[in-house]
Amino acid sequence: MKSSIRQKLELLVDRLDEIDRMLSAPSTASDMDQFRKLSRERAEVEPVVVQFNAFRQAENDLAEAEAMLSDPDMREFAEEEMAAAKARLPELELELQKLLLPKDPNDERSVLLEIRAGTGGDESALFAGSLFRMYSRFAERQRWQVEVMSASESELGGYREIICRIAGNGAYSRLKFESGGHRVQRVPETETQGRIHTSACTVAVMPEVDEVEDVNLNPADLRIDTFRASGAGGQHINKTDSAVRITHLPTGIVAECQDGRSQHANKASALKVLAARIKDVQVRAQQAHISSTRKSLIGSGDRSERIRTYNFPQGRITDHRINLTLYKIAAIMDGDMDELLGALAAEHQADLLAELAEQN
């Protein structure tokens, strides 16, 4: 283990002792904010210290076994103990490195998922519907809630655009690698000659902002327009200007919602989408800066960047970022995304570990 990493770990051991002393102090017990803050920190530090203690125990076991080699009666036992300790140490060190990786502050958040039809006309809109179903089925498997916030349906089915909220702990950590261009190759239902068509959709995954106030939205910077809703949502909404469009004038970012039952509900939904989009722009700017200095699996923040191809005739899905091809397209489109998302998360973790090694 590198000395710089060991020093960090030894500091964390001392910090855990300090936290325990502070938590047991009467002054902390009477200050609930401080108590909660220290308790959260302890929950983050303790697993690292426990793992480091296991690593140090394996080091001690190895040293004791090496000391026994000079005893002929203990030599065979010592060699077995040495082999076991040497096998255990790299595993423990890797787990420690993973625990030391910086955590994405948005990982535990719910998400706003936006799917837009791109090139390919009606087939692209149908594919947007297929993608929405895929993510919805995946969310159901995680016991997450899916709420459609805004949808623009196409004439033949599917969506020109759909925005939904997926609520559940860790939703962003699982879905954040989905942002980008998704290309499909298949024979459309409207195709009479059996020719394969290529079309595309863009997906944006944005961490939900806890409160709209988390993003500094000055009311003077907002233009709010109302208009008559169209499409799904009930015929009664066409009689009033219940649909809402909000424009953030400094950035030109727009959000509109018309699926709610009232203007008030649509305004609240549009504000939530607008806040998430503004925060997403900020996050993507950070990602662009990061990707200029090192490889970033999430990408440069360019939504048009093609990340995945869905080839239905061949039954395969290829993720171009990690050169992974899976021949299980039916299962994945039905929400069985664990293998795909797990491979992306593992690659991202490997990138972070490589960066940690460079820093140390």
From Swiss-Prot:
Free-text description of this protein's post-translational modifications in UniProt: Methylated by PrmC. Methylation increases the termination efficiency of RF1.
GO molecular function: translation release factor activity, codon specific
Disulfide partners: none
Organism superkingdom: Bacteria
UniProt GO cellular component terms: cytoplasm
Assigned protein family: Belongs to the prokaryotic/mitochondrial release factor family.
Listed NCBIfam families: prfA (TIGR00019), PRK00591.1 (NF001859)
Function: Peptide chain release factor 1 directs the termination of translation in response to the peptide chain termination codons UAG and UAA.
PANTHER family according to UniProt: LD18447P
Protein name: Peptide chain release factor 1
